[in-house]
Amino acid sequence: MGIHAEQPKESIEEQIQRLCATVPDYPEPGITFRDLTPVFADGAALRAVVDALVEPFAGQFDAVAGVEARGFLLAAAAAYATGTGVITVRKAGKLPRAVYTEHYSLEYGTAALELHRDDLPAGSRVLILDDVLATGGTLAATSKLFAKAGVNVAGYGVVLELAELHGREALAGHQIRSLVRL
């Protein structure tokens, strides 16, 4: 044993909290934005995040879906790591072929997400990944898109969950893996 003892390995939660940037008053005054891009920019942290998100769902999905935009980063890495396909859930008007559309409420107004109708065959299983779970509206809309396609949702994985916004309630009945709950 040398003079320098090996440091204990940092947990995934500790890595995320260390790397996540907190931006006050963004995108508007009174809002505290949690920027996960420094987590994704760190290769070891990104690998640890992806591994931690998919591990509870091992063998339970045929493809990984990412919600625009940061969900794409997670889904592509997870699909590659697990040898499955990646599916993109996009904002309305961004996909070129026939789509399913799901409208959902935002704090101020509404939005819509779309999924290509032929991305996955009916009966397939999909793991849905996104960066943050807040109110659950975006992920619930994503789940409805896959239901329209006859695709089963294996579960949800998110890096950061804002627990005070009760997003889990909108996703009742599905397994949710969140790496950090604030």
From Swiss-Prot:
<keyword id="KW-0808">Transferase</keyword>
<dbReference type="InterPro" id="IPR050054">
    <property type="entry name" value="UPRTase/APRTase"/>
</dbReference>
<keyword id="KW-0963">Cytoplasm</keyword>
<comment type="similarity">
    <text>Belongs to the purine/pyrimidine phosphoribosyltransferase family.</text>
</comment>
<dbReference type="GO" id="GO:0003999">
    <property type="term" value="F:adenine phosphoribosyltransferase activity"/>
</dbReference>
<comment type="pathway">
    <text>Purine metabolism; AMP biosynthesis via salvage pathway; AMP from adenine: step 1/1.</text>
</comment>
<dbReference type="InterPro" id="IPR000836">
    <property type="entry name" value="PRibTrfase_dom"/>
</dbReference>
<comment type="subunit">
    <text>Homodimer.</text>
</comment>
<dbReference type="GO" id="GO:0002055">
    <property type="term" value="F:adenine binding"/>
</dbReference>
<dbReference type="GO" id="GO:0016208">
    <property type="term" value="F:AMP binding"/>
</dbReference>
<dbReference type="GO" id="GO:0006166">
    <property type="term" value="P:purine ribonucleoside salvage"/>
</dbReference>
<comment type="function">
    <text>Catalyzes a salvage reaction resulting in the formation of AMP, that is energically less costly than de novo synthesis.</text>
</comment>
<dbReference type="InterPro" id="IPR029057">
    <property type="entry name" value="PRTase-like"/>
</dbReference>
<dbReference type="GO" id="GO:0044209">
    <property type="term" value="P:AMP salvage"/>
</dbReference>
<dbReference type="GO" id="GO:0006168">
    <property type="term" value="P:adenine salvage"/>
</dbReference>
<keyword id="KW-0660">Purine salvage</keyword>
<protein>
    <recommendedName>
        <fullName>Adenine phosphoribosyltransferase</fullName>
        <ecNumber>2.4.2.7</ecNumber>
    </recommendedName>
</protein>
<dbReference type="GO" id="GO:0005737">
    <property type="term" value="C:cytoplasm"/>
</dbReference>
<dbReference type="InterPro" id="IPR005764">
    <property type="entry name" value="Ade_phspho_trans"/>
</dbReference>
<keyword id="KW-0328">Glycosyltransferase</keyword>
<dbReference type="Pfam" id="PF00156">
    <property type="entry name" value="Pribosyltran"/>
</dbReference>
